């Protein structure tokens, strides 16, 4: 079957849920037996979000092949349950970088390099590349930002040209827009949507389907009005109401007929949708019978999107144990030895996620000490694992001032140190240990009990690691090296004895968890937290 292309744009305001809409549609099409891939176009000039502040961008999601990408790729992977690649995130910076390098090599044979055709051709090639990479039936491309943003214009021109190139019936434009409800007037206003579509049509794109984000169900009259002024059939106006749980959205959009509309407009040869697995999962989510509280101790807690995959993975662990997970957000800068008892006394488990820099580091270490001494389930990820090693070195081995050389380059006991192959690297972007690496597990450990495999593969994003100069001293005092690289050079997982569940991992398991396939470590972490709570 010839590959079909779906483009999702946004209007009126940002953060409308284009990514969830694209991911939900991808799930519905996959449930019809189609092979689907999704990509995100981001109009910012950064090559990738790897060096951006979490306050600016939220989480950096890492793919198997080591790409640092937009957090929407996490939604895509969780919803369609497929591993994406570096080709699934395209930025203005990445495209211009490629075009300028081609110009320097002389690939354009002395021609004047311009936005049209050179930038737009590069953008089109990135769309077609995804189709070829995995031989998929459908490629869904989300265009970041809002129609009308000046930086989005080359992206919109590129997808306009693709519709012309692939021919009628092989592409579909979906516009996600806001329908504000004025409570005082008691009515939904359609004018912002009309103007957004007018802007889109002004650059040559006629939406085939309009998805309306609204807090109130829209009537047939409102659909007809939008259809009339936006030049589409009223039946092609879809209502996308607020949902209690993200994973309900595919079923809500199916009830609105979105996937049927897309199949009809793209003339897709596919089977009837089978949402039974997803429906069963959502039913389970709605009937969770218990609750556990997990203290997430981090430095970016004001912006929950900075830890979105961690939170979703905790929820997945809850699904597997029939409990809802209440995340208690704890700013690590505010945790001290004097207040740690009161701050953490009401949690059933403690998670310290990844991060960079010294801000809040002592609060994380203090929280880990409290979890270790009070036998509260602990899960450390990346920097969280490194902090666990530092805490153990200080308080069990008595190595006063032990630290990471990232935080204290002059420390007498650098139990965490820069990886040898990172020492001559000056550039910050894309130079860390990134992507999927193997890890060999030791038997009779919590990690092995969770995975039930000797060799696992997980995604990494770090420059610093466990310093092997301290391996012997730490293990002699009870630190367990539960997982290492296959050559035994890198320590990937640490645990401790005589504790219900204390696990630190150098990798990022949250990037591989799915709502229908919870990650084993998150599953077991929540399981033990439930047990400890019952006691």
Swiss-Prot record:
Molecular function GO terms recorded: ATP binding; CTP synthase activity; glutaminase activity; identical protein binding; metal ion binding
Note, other: CTPSs have evolved a hybrid strategy for distinguishing between UTP and CTP. The overlapping regions of the product feedback inhibitory and substrate sites recognize a common feature in both compounds, the triphosphate moiety. To differentiate isosteric substrate and product pyrimidine rings, an additional pocket far from the expected kinase/ligase catalytic site, specifically recognizes the cytosine and ribose portions of the product inhibitor.
Regulation of catalytic or functional activity: Allosterically activated by GTP, when glutamine is the substrate; GTP has no effect on the reaction when ammonia is the substrate. The allosteric effector GTP functions by stabilizing the protein conformation that binds the tetrahedral intermediate(s) formed during glutamine hydrolysis. Inhibited by the product CTP, via allosteric rather than competitive inhibition.
Catalytic activity from the UniProt record: UTP + L-glutamine + ATP + H2O = CTP + L-glutamate + ADP + phosphate + 2 H(+); L-glutamine + H2O = L-glutamate + NH4(+); UTP + NH4(+) + ATP = CTP + ADP + phosphate + 2 H(+)
Family note: Belongs to the CTP synthase family.
Pathway(s) it belongs to: Pyrimidine metabolism; CTP biosynthesis via de novo pathway; CTP from UDP: step 2/2
GO biological process: 'de novo' CTP biosynthetic process; pyrimidine nucleobase biosynthetic process
Region entry Amidoligase domain, spans: 1-268
Positions of UTP binding: 14, 189-194, 225
Name of the molecule in the record: CTP synthase
Record-listed ATP binding positions: 15-20, 72
Start and end residues of each Glutamine amidotransferase type-1 domain: 293-535
Spans traversing the lipid bilayer: none
Domain of life of the organism encoding this protein: Bacteria
Active site: 382, 508, 510
Binding site for CTP: 14, 149-151, 189-194, 225
Task performed by this protein: Catalyzes the ATP-dependent amination of UTP to CTP with either L-glutamine or ammonia as the source of nitrogen. Regulates intracellular CTP levels through interactions with the four ribonucleotide triphosphates.
Keywords: ATP-binding, Glutamine amidotransferase, Ligase, Magnesium, Metal-binding, Nucleotide-binding, Pyrimidine biosynthesis
GO cellular component: cytosol
Residues that coordinate or bind Mg(2+): 72, 142
Pfam families, sorted: CTP_synth_N, GATase
Keyword ATP-binding: yes
Top EC class for this record: ligase
């Amino acid at each position: 079957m010839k590959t079909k292309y779906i483009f999702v744009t946004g209007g009126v305001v940002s953060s409308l849920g284009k990514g969830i809409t694209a991911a939900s549609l991808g799930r519905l099409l996959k449930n019809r037996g189609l092979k689907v891939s999704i990509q995100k176009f981001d109009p910012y000039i950064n090559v990738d979000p790897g060096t951006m502040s979490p306050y600016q961008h939220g989480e950096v999601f890492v793919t198997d092949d080591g790409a640092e990408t937009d957090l929407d790729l996490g939604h895509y992977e969780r919803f369609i349950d497929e591993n994406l690649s570096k080709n699934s995130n395209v930025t203005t910076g990445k495209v211009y970088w490629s075009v300028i390098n081609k110009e320097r090599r002389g690939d354009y044979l002395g021609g004047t390099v311009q936005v049209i055709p050179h930038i737009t051709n590069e953008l089109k090639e990135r769309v077609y590349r995804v189709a070829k990479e995995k031989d998929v039936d459908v490629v869904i491309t989300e265009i970041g930002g809002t129609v009308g943003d000046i930086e989005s214009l080359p992206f919109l021109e590129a997808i306009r040209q693709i519709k012309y190139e692939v021919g009628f019936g092989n592409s579909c434009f979906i516009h996600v827009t806001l329908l504000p409800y004025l409570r005082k007037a008691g009515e939904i206003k359609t004018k912002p949507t009309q103007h957004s579509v007018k802007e889109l049509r002004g650059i040559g794109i006629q939406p085939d389907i309009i998805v309306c984000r609204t807090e109130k169900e829209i009537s047939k009259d409102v659909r007809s009005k939008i259809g009339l002024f936006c030049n589409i059939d009223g039946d092609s106006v879809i209502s996308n109401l607020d949902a209690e749980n993200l994973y309900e959205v595919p079923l809500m959009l199916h009830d609105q007929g979105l996937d049927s509309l897309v199949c009809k407009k793209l003339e897709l040869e596919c089977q009837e949708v089978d949402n039974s697995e997803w429906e069963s999962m959502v039913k389970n989510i709605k009937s969770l019978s218990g609750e556990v509280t997990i203290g997430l101790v981090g430095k970016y807690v004001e912006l929950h999107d900075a830890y979105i995959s961690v939170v979703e993975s905790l929820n997945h662990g809850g699904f597997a144990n029939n409990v809802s997970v209440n995340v208690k957000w704890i700013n690590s800068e505010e945790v001290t030895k004097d207040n740690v008892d009161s701050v953490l006394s009401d949690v059933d488990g403690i998670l310290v996620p990844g991060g960079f820099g010294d801000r809040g580091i002592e609060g994380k270490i203090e929280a880990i000490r409290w979890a270790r001494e009070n036998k509260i389930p602990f899960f450390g990820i990346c920097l969280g694992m490194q902090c666990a090693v530092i805490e153990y070195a200080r308080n069990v081995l008595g190595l006063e001032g032990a630290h990471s050389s990232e935080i204290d380059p002059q420390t007498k006991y650098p139990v965490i140190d820069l990886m040898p192959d990172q020492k001559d690297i000056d550039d910050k972007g894309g130079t860390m240990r990134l992507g999927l690496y193997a890890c060999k597990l030791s038997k009779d450990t919590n990690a092995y009990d969770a995975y039930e495999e000797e060799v696992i593969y997980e995604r990494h994003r770090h420059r610093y690691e466990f310093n092997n100069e301290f391996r012997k001293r730490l293990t002699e005092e009870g630190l367990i090296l539960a997982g290492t690289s296959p050559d035994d050079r890198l320590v990937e997982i640490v645990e401790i004895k005589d504790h219900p569940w204390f696990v630190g991992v150098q990798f990022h398991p949250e990037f591989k968890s799915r709502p229908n396939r919870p990650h084993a470590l998150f599953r077991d972490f929540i399981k033990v937290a439930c047990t400890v709570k019952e006691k």
